Amino acid sequence: MTTAARPTFEPARGGRGKGEGDLSQLSKQYSSRDLPSHTKIKYRQTTQDAPEEVRNRDFRRELEERERAAARDKNRDRPTREHTTSSSVSKKPRLDQIPAANLDADDPLTDEEDEDFEEESDDDDTAALLAELEKIKKERAEEQARKEQEQKAEEERIRMENILSGNPLLNLTGPSQPQANFKVKRRWDDDVVFKNCAKGIDDQKKDKRFVNDTLRSEFHKKFMEKYIK
């Protein structure tokens, strides 16, 4: 049963605990991670390539020993391979041991002919692959040249269209088409309120007057007449 609910007859008082004789002194608390952990230097052991040990080693002798061990392992595996090869060769029937009834003109008589035939077939395959590769390269080069030519023709067409459409003297239409309109269009801000305010009153027309009110200005009236009414 818990004793958390029981009353405390002796409550804790400041300055009565351990190390709390002076209340003006701040309490200090340290964590285990704040304490120094590595207080001793670790040295290399005899098998960890210490400098003295490296100086005393004879690397050349160790290398020669490893090479001799590798040669011994290689020679140990060689008799087994030679025995396997000799047994496989001995299994092949000799030409003089084959009866005459089993001989056929289509059957290969020696392994050299088989090797020559395989080499010729390999050469033929290589030549065919090289020819196919050259064909593919040629087709790709032709396709690239065709695309470049089409791109140049398109760029030339666009350039000529820009030249003809940009020059009004060369852009004259025929008799069947409507005549070109060379009239200069007015700007959208020709009739705004605060345009050319720095000019004198004499430069302006007599029938126009300045009104510092956007609702009673001529521009607002024209706008309402044109778009609202």
From Swiss-Prot:
Subunit annotation: Identified in the spliceosome C complex. Component of the PRP19-CDC5L splicing complex composed of a core complex comprising a homotetramer of PRPF19, CDC5L, PLRG1 and BCAS2, and at least three less stably associated proteins CTNNBL1, CWC15 and HSPA8. Interacts directly with CTNNBL1 in the complex. Component of the minor spliceosome, which splices U12-type introns.
Biased composition annotated in UniProt, kind: Basic and acidic residues: 52-84
Family: Belongs to the CWC15 family.
GO biological processes: mRNA splicing, via spliceosome
Region (Disordered): 1-133
Modification N-acetylthreonine occurs at: T2
Family annotation (InterPro entries): Cwf_Cwc_15
Modification type Phosphothreonine: residues: T47, T110
Subcellular location: Nucleus
Keyword vocabulary terms for this entry: Acetylation, Coiled coil, mRNA processing, mRNA splicing, Nucleus, Phosphoprotein, Spliceosome
Residues with the N6-acetyllysine modification: K18
A Pfam family reported for this protein in Swiss-Prot or TrEMBL: Cwf_Cwc_15
Segments of skewed composition (Polar residues): 24-34
Bias-annotated ranges (Acidic residues): 104-126
UniProt feature coiled coil, ranges: 123-165
Organism superkingdom: Eukaryota
Any one GO CC term of the record: mitochondrion
Main location: nucleus
GO MF annotation, one: RNA binding
Protein name: Spliceosome-associated protein CWC15 homolog
Taxonomic lineage: Eukaryota, Metazoa, Chordata, Craniata, Vertebrata
Modified residues (Phosphoserine): S121
Function description: Involved in pre-mRNA splicing as component of the spliceosome. Component of the PRP19-CDC5L complex that forms an integral part of the spliceosome and is required for activating pre-mRNA splicing. As a component of the minor spliceosome, involved in the splicing of U12-type introns in pre-mRNAs.
Keyword Disulfide bond set for record: no
